């Protein structure tokens, strides 16, 4: 049996031995909207829990729009024009619009990358800036979270009359689901805020899990959102594996996000017969598999669940292009010292992790006790040989999947 798995900007052909017990686990997000521009306009003009965007923007001189960075497949090329049209209809001039790229602690984006995600029509006409999480001059302190985490946000936001948060919804290994006020925290917040929030995943009992929205991280983010002293409007979308917009939700950041998550839960959740001996977790293609750091989203779709999809004595194969290697988040200047430290809690939940990618160096993998294979077929053959009649799960779009065992 041969299947095509998302890999970088293309697909990778992977052959599975016919004698193996293979279970295919893939969500169905549905077809893309026939007219996404009309869909976006409709939800911006008929939002959930708030006035239409144009009404809120009327009289505003400065508006900040927060967008996702290159590591997310958010269709900003479609979303930005829809938002900007409403702002112009309200009388906001192009000079008054600032687009802030929510890179969080990731590397900043190049001009070419910015043009790619916002579109050639937007980039030269509107100001687009990378967030700077480590530069105090670019940050404004706005208080503390309920747990005492210092809250800071990009200064462009607080100097605006209105902020528009954009993003897409997917299962998230710490927040439960992405989107909502997460576009503020951690996307455009200071490094102390980012570290404080991510430390919540280390709380005893691992209360922050994939696909569970009721958790300390999300509660903290949602409590911090109203600290931002600017009226905030949200636009979140649900996309399918082809990066097409399926549904769109706009309005009050809490209410619109809750509606978007409820829709995503129905589409992302897939029943799984039982925990497997071997799980092949695909990185989901570009940009989800841009680096091994982003590959954590595929790995946690297997292990960071109330009921992990791999047995305690099982193995996980992580497949992705990982064109940027480990990612800028590791090593000097990064948020993590090394791979072994960053992934320690995940690695202890399985016998072995094997990475399949030509772009990840051997040394940091070996130092973390992670195996490496030249091909998916080699990894499958090697892992399956350790079991008698192994049960194998294949998750082509692991970062977008919530597998539920009985």
Task: Please provide the spans of the model-predicted regions.
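Short internal beta-strands
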Residues: 94-105, 315-321, 351-358
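Short glycine-rich or small-residue beta-strand-to-loop segments that form or flank ligand, phosphate
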Residues: 62-73, 98-104, 280-282
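A glycine-rich helix N-cap at a beta->alpha junction
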Residues: 114-139, 340-341, 345-348, 358-359
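N-terminal amphipathic/basic leader segments beginning at the initiator methionine
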Residues: 1-44
């Amino acid at each position: 049996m041969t299947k095509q798995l998302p890999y970088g900007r293309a697909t990778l052909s992977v052959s599975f031995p016919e004698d193996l017990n293979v279970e295919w686990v893939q969500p169905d997000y549905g077809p893309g909207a026939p007219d996404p521009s009309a869909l976006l306009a409709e939800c911006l003009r008929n939002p959930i829990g708030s006035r239409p965007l144009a009404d809120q923007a009327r009289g505003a001189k400065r508006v900040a729009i927060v967008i996702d960075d290159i590591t997310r497949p958010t269709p900003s090329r479609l979303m930005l024009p829809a938002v900007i049209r409403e702002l112009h209809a309200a009388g906001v001039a192009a000079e008054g619009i600032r687009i802030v790229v929510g890179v969080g602690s990731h590397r900043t984006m190049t001009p070419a990358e910015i043009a790619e995600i916002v579109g050639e029509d937007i980039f030269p006409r509107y100001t687009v800036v990378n967030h700077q999480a480590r530069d105090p001059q670019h940050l404004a302190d706005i208080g503390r979270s309920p747990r005492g985490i210092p809250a800071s946000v990009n200064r462009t936001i607080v100097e605006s009359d209105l902020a528009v948060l954009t993003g897409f919804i997917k299962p998230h290994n710490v927040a439960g689901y992405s989107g909502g006020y997460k576009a503020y925290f951690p996307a455009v917040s200071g490094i102390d805020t980012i570290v404080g929030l991510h430390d919540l995943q280390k709380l005893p009992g691992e209360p922050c899990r994939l696909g569970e929205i009721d958790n300390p991280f999300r509660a903290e983010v949602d409590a911090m959102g109203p600290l931002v002293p600017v009226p905030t409007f949200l636009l979140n979308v649900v996309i399918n594996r082809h990066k097409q917009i399926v549904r769109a939700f706009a309005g009050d950041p809490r209410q619109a996000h809750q509606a978007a998550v409820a829709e995503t839960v129905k589409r992302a959740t897939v029943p799984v017969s039982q925990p497997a001996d071997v799980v092949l977790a695909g990185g989901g293609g570009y940009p989800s598999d841009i680096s091994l750091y982003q590959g954590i989203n595929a790995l946690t779709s297997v292990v960071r669940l109330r009921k992990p999809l791999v047995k305690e004595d099982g193995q996980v194969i992580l497949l992705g292009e990982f064109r940027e290697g480990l990612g800028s988040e590791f090593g000097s200047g990064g948020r993590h010292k090394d791979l072994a430290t960053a992934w320690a809690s995940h690695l202890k939940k399985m016998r072995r992790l094997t990475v399949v990618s030509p772009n990840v160096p051997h040394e940091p993998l070996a130092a973390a006790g992670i195996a490496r294979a030249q091909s998916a077929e080699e990894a499958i053959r090697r892992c399956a040989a350790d079991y008698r009649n192994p049960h194998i799960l294949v998750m082509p779009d692991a970062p977008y999947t919530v597998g539920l065992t009985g």
